[in-house]
Amino acid sequence: MSDRIDRDVINALIAGHFADPFSVLGMHKTTAGLEVRALLPDATDVWVIEPKTGRKLAKLECLDSRGFFSGVIPRRKNFFRYQLAVVWHGQQNLIDDPYRFGPLIQEMDAWLLSEGTHLRPYETLGAHADTMDGVTGTRFSVWAPNARRVSVVGQFNYWDGRRHPMRLRKESGIWELFIPGAHNGQLYKYEMIDANGNLRLKSDPYAFEAQMRPETASLICGLPEKVVQTEERKKANQFDAPISIYEVHLGSWRRHTDNNFWLSYRELADQLVPYAKWMGFTHLELLPINEHPFDGSWGYQPTGLYAPTRRFGTRDDFRYFIDAAHAAGLNVILDWVPGHFPTDDFALAEFDGTNLYEHSDPREGYHQDWNTLIYNYGRREVSNFLVGNALYWIERFGIDALRVDAVASMIYRDYSRKEGEWIPNEFGGRENLEAIEFLRNTNRILGEQVSGAVTMAEESTDFPGVSRPQDMGGLGFWYKWNLGWMHDTLDYMKLDPIYRQYHHDKLTFGMLYNNTENFVLPLSHDEVVHGKKSILDRMPGDAWQKFANLRAYYGWMWAFPGKKLLFMGNEFAQGREWNHDASLDWHLLEGGDNWHHGVQRLVRDLNLTYRHHKAMHELDFDPYGFEWLVVDDKERSVLIFVRRDKEGNEIIVASNFTPVPRHDYRFGINQPGKWREILNTDSMHYHGSNAGNGGTVHSDEIASHGRQHSLSLTLPPLATIWLVREAE
């Protein structure tokens, strides 16, 4: 008889409490010879089969009626390839034994994963189609170092955790198993007995696709092919490029009118992409599309960082959408959320029964504002999971930029916390040093591995050097959202024009710090929710004045140094706040030509004009690219400045933020000659009053504002005009 398997071991295996199934199951050399053991619940008969001939080599004895079989193979001494013929419910099935295969993860991969320096952990962890010893199937790997047992359960094994317990690689805390026959399209999860002895079902942190909510299973889905970065896409992200971003929530941009259901990724490719291109935008920014359980989070509480949400279609459908955007000349920015994750039990929270991905102390690991958990960036495997995710979206989907959400909440330990609710760092400070290092490391790796892709930070404080290189002490982002500019200018615009003279500095203050960062000027989704009103509705006055104010503001914004970002609906002056459960108010553009059409035409013309003239974008972050001509006329709420390109070509921008037209308004200029009006937000084309300067105006050799030559203009009411100097 063979080496006897202890009854306690059999009981533990069947109960799912045995942590080392490979030490028992599969083929083993024993004193009696070569022995095969299998755990096959509900099986009645099991034979060992010679694959080449189909010959039955031995029948396994049922040692436990719950499905434990064992038997010695006669006349065999060395390990060989075999299959099992298993009879279930009177039907014979030929299967490959998962427990005859050796370790899956290579030593170098295991070492890099443990060190947290594996550039692409998603190529090893998760579910991957594979062929081993001529057998096709799927290899599964999951990091859960404190679990007592982990099994793969899914459609291929009746969701029975007894059937496929995994091998623990103790050196890395990773559990692994190759399951023959498991294939793309099948659902799976990890069933584990956690560190506390509780039975848990967990989705795969590295799942590349997932079920549609409210279901939570992962989907076997191979890695997508890498997307080549083109020189055109790289160039479109550069500091001197025109960048005008259309920020979109895919679930509410437009919906089916008959049932209010979302458009699919492919429908969005056919509708959203050509619309954004026609409007003249250069980039699409998508609110998070990572899988998330709660629609009301807008994607900012993700549970599946590696899986595009199934709300709008499959992973391949999302790839189709990205490809369509690129074909239309649009770069794609993805909102990325490495700052926190939800508490849902099926996901990362207490993954193996311990605080594996999060901090154990709620003063470090819990966001009371959002009821979410904070990643433990100091744990190597966690930061590796996140850095790898950033690279994954860029390499495997062709994402051109990542906009990192809520950076301030990551880099400050006392973010939104009272005294006593946070733990200082090792030096007694408030900075989260591990998060800062994580962000720097992410930006460094992206710069090295996918040069041309960029990152943008939503950072709401004055933390120094967010968009400065790391060798200068910065975080290494390419761009930073200028939330201060946004708040100041919106606070100014909501004032009745009669009071604006007392708040003139709200429009000028931004230039005092403009060159400290590489700024994006954002009118984002955050400004049209939670009772803040729409941008249009914040403007003072009657309907005519509201639209005129908005047009003047857009003209100012597109001319001011910094890249542009506009949330969907603002391009046609939607009057309501954004509702993530409904379509934008496209009906405002139905019927006859109206004020909303005027704003839409203006935004399109702003984009096209801004892109055409290098002076409006080439030197956004160089002091030479901007100069005030009139900065102190607060009594009349007039501001005039010059934008300049590398060759010295200038565009004059003049704004009048009162409803009083200013006739014969004289100001000094640098370059005498004939100036042509290339944009006037008061144009009749945009439903303005059509005041202006008749197309062109000549300078006079009359000194003004310390300059020898000057222009005398009509400044339309509540309007911004752009003028370019005609060639001699």
Swiss-Prot record:
SMART domains: Aamy (SM00642)
Keywords: Carbohydrate metabolism, Glycogen biosynthesis, Glycogen metabolism, Glycosyltransferase, Transferase
Recorded metabolic or biological pathway in which this protein acts: Glycan biosynthesis; glycogen biosynthesis
A GO biological-process term: glycogen biosynthetic process
Listed SUPFAM superfamilies: (Trans)glycosidases (SSF51445), E set domains (SSF81296), Glycosyl hydrolase domain (SSF51011)
One annotated GO molecular function: 1,4-alpha-glucan branching enzyme activity
Gene3D superfamilies: Glycosidases (3.20.20.80), Golgi alpha-mannosidase II (2.60.40.1180), Immunoglobulins (2.60.40.10)
A single Gene Ontology CC term: cytosol
Pfam families found in the cross-reference section: Alpha-amylase, Alpha-amylase_C, CBM_48, GlgB_N
UniProt cross-references to InterPro entries, sorted A to Z: A-amylase/branching_C, Branching_enzy, GlgB, GlgB_N, GlgB_N_E_set_prok, Glyco_hydro_13_cat_dom, Glyco_hydro_13_N, Glyco_hydro_b
E.C. code: 2.4.1.18
Catalytic site: 405 (nucleophile), 458 (proton donor)
Family: Belongs to the glycosyl hydrolase 13 family. GlgB subfamily.
Function: Catalyzes the formation of the alpha-1,6-glucosidic linkages in glycogen by scission of a 1,4-alpha-linked oligosaccharide from growing alpha-1,4-glucan chains and the subsequent attachment of the oligosaccharide to the alpha-1,6 position.
Subunit structure: Monomer.
Protein name from the UniProt record: 1,4-alpha-glucan branching enzyme GlgB
Organism name: Shigella dysenteriae serotype 1 (strain Sd197)
Species lineage: Bacteria, Pseudomonadati, Pseudomonadota, Gammaproteobacteria, Enterobacterales
